[in-house]
Amino acid sequence: FTVGQRKGLALGTPAPDGKPRFVLEIRPKTNEVIVGSRELLSIDEIRGIRATWAGIPVPEAEHFLAQEPKLGVRSETFDVTAQVRAHADPVRGTAHLEWAEDTDAETPGKLRVETVVRLHDGLFGVAPGQTMVLYQGTRVLGQSTIARAYSLAREDLDDLRENAAV
């Protein structure tokens, strides 16, 4: 399966609203494929890892990187435009850096810096492994590899589902 895929899902029963369903997320560790409406494919927030800065980072990032690592600590936000595909239009948003647990590390509790970008307008077709380039005006700030891209609307639905199950 591929994120965004619509055909060949072999779901058996249609969605309650009769609209097509799409692959929203693939979870290889649990062997799950999450499906939902097209609207839930729109990505509002991207988390990048292994950032590379072009020159001196913006002051908010530079100040953050000079501090001692601590889980959950985040930088001040700064305005950016983010570009995910080479020929796609950049999308405006705000970004911050955050210390998060490195889920790919062999050592539990290891921390990594994640670049978190909240987009003003959603993007479609964003997937882990792609590169995200950040700009301020015409200045390239740097790039990072997308570790997670998700829809805040989908998280709201997940929260509703969890609260309803309690």
Task: Annotate each predicted stretch with a short phrase.
Residues 1-166:
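AMP-forming adenylation/ATP pyrophosphatase catalytic core
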